[in-house]
Regions:
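Flexible loop/turn connectors
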Residues: 20-118
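Structural motif
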Residues: 2-20
Length: 118
């Protein structure tokens, strides 16, 4: 889904999906605010969540659990990911001009928080 006003983008994203596909049984969003827009659009179009369409967010913010229909989400280690990215930038800045930064492959653990939208 596009970036910007997350709520509106989530809402408009459902409209675009309805135009492009006959049936959609699941929607994954990048942020809970997009998910809130998706849930609103689905409700207004008469779709039942999760019976007809499942919704999952990739951010895992607490707000998703506070909704009327609590949103399922993936809990990502954002602080750890941000710290590692900052460390890599600092290593690159501090490296000698003739040193290339090494390519690094990192895997971060996630946790599925199952709620009412799946």
């Amino acid at each position: 889904m596009p970036r910007g006003n997350y709520f509106k983008d989530g809402y408009k994203g459902v409209e675009r999906l309805k135009e492009a596909f006959d049936e959609v049984d699941g929607i994954m969003v990048a942020a809970d605010m997009q998910g809130i827009g998706v849930l609103r659009a689905l409700k207004e179009s008469g779709k039942k969540v999760p019976k007809e369409v499942k919704v999952i967010s990739l951010t895992g913010h607490a707000i998703g659990g506070m909704l009327e229909t609590a949103m399922t989400s993936m809990e990502l280690p954002g602080r750890e990911m941000g710290q590692r990215a900052a460390d890599m930038i600092l290593e690159d800045i501090e490296a000698a001009d003739d040193e290339k930064p090494s390519v690094q492959h990192m895997v971060f653990g996630t946790k599925l928080i199952e709620r009412e939208t799946t």
